[in-house]
């Protein structure tokens, strides 16, 4: 009898988290989920496919690996959520596959409390992955207000716009790797792109002021 498995509070939270996230990410075909729960895969919770403009084409432009965590254990101070990720398998998995599909960690707060659920996300960017001490077994992940997805169309659309930026950046990195640029060549390309991005942001700021 002692070997018979039961449903734990954590597994219940993770299952609820998957359900909550699928509800929050309804986006008229932009985000097509294929999530899994109960540790079906050892290092991730499967994927979603991103379709930027489903009214033009239903063909996905990028697959994202995901990890979905439901939790009641977190702290909030001055708008910043802090959560302890007790297993680094997912970021390690993405780090090993960094030139392939990108990864996103989703953390759902209070997933079993109907109406009180909150959804946060963290892109496994190269900078974020480089900040992890993989010699340790856990890490604290901080989420800013900009990394919260609200259960409304405007917030989900903003998240989709962030996904488009990630897809462009990820594609750019892959192109650099495929062309085997030297360090100096890659540096010049990145600096030129940074200048173009800065100029675009400045132009947007001027337009907004006018």
Placement of each model-derived feature along the sequence:
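Mixed-charge (Asp/Glu-Lys/Arg
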Residues: 1-42, 48-210
């Amino acid at each position: 009898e002692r070997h018979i498995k039961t449903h734990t509070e954590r597994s219940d939270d993770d299952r609820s988290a998957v359900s909550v996230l699928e509800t929050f990410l309804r986006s008229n075909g932009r985000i097509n989920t294929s999530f899994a729960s109960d540790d079906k895969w050892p290092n991730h919770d499967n994927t979603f496919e991103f379709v930027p403009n489903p009214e033009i084409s239903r063909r996905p432009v990028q697959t994202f690996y995901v990890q979905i965590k439901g939790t009641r254990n977190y702290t909030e101070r001055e708008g910043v959520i802090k959560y302890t990720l007790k297993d680094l398998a997912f970021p390690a998995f993405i780090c090993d596959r960094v030139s392939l599909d990108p990864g996103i960690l989703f953390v759902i707060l209070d997933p079993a409390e109907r109406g009180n659920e909150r959804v946060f996300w963290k892109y496994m960017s190269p900078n974020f992955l480089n900040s992890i001490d993989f010699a340790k077994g856990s890490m604290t992940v901080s989420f800013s207000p900009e990394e919260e997805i609200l259960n409304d169309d405007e917030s989900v659309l903003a998240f989709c716009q962030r996904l488009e930026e990630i897809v462009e950046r990820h594609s750019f990195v892959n192109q650099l790797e495929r062309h085997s640029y030297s360090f100096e060549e890659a540096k010049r390309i990145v600096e030129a792109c940074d200048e173009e991005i800065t100029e675009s942001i400045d132009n947007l700021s001027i337009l907004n002021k006018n």
